[in-house]
Amino acid sequence: MGVSVKRIVVTGMGIVSPLGCGVQHVWQSLLAGKSGITRLSEQLVADIPCKVAGQVPSIDSDPLHGFDPLATIPAKERKKMDRFIEFALVAAREALTQAGWTPASAAEQERTATVIATGIGGFSEIANAVHTTDERGPRRLSPFTIPSFLANLAAGHVSIAHGFRGPIGAPVTACAAGAQAIGDAARMIRSGEADIALCGGAEAAIHRVSLAGFAAARALSSAYSDQPESASRPFDRD
């Protein structure tokens, strides 16, 4: 006898990326061969070998497809979270809109899982907290300091924002984190823990410390600073 495997389908997607926001726009940009790698400010990387990164464009630099957190997140709430959480909230809204999923009943809410991964979490907020503590003293820290950078709070904020009460997860497995989140979500559905799962990954780790650390590990491109679009060369023999 064959083993019956529960079928799982993707019904909605959302994205915040260096190519901009919105699945359709980003997909068309990829098909056109566009690169999202750009040069970083000299102030940030003056003494760091790598001068380029995949920076998410702001709504000011790209009025059509730039990142606009205020369209999704109240200004007061933004003060309580790192940028990676903002990315998750904006991408999640697009995915849920595309899927048409707005659980209203308690049963639907309890059967909706949230699994959002990150490799590092709120790196910038951690660094800011260290700076504040060193320069101004520990009493100057906000009560929201810890929640602002915890790796699991991307999933936490998304589930709270949409009223999900099902299983929650936050894989922290470096570069494999986003892929693991998708796998974990699929297993939750297949095992019967959930009927619906919102899953993915979010990262916002462009900071002098992270750039310097990865550069020290020789994990960043340093040969194409004047040609950012050529910096990502995964199959280049040199």
What residues fall within each predicted segment?
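ACP-dependent fatty acid/polyketide chain-elongation machinery
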Residues: 1-77
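Structured loops at beta-to-helix junctions and adjacent beta-edge loops in soluble globular domains
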Residues: 13, 117-119
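Acyl-thioester C-C bond-transforming condensing/cleaving domain
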Residues: 2-5, 21, 32-42, 78, ...
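A glycine- and small-residue-enriched flexible loop/hinge segment at structural boundaries
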Residues: 43-101, 151-165
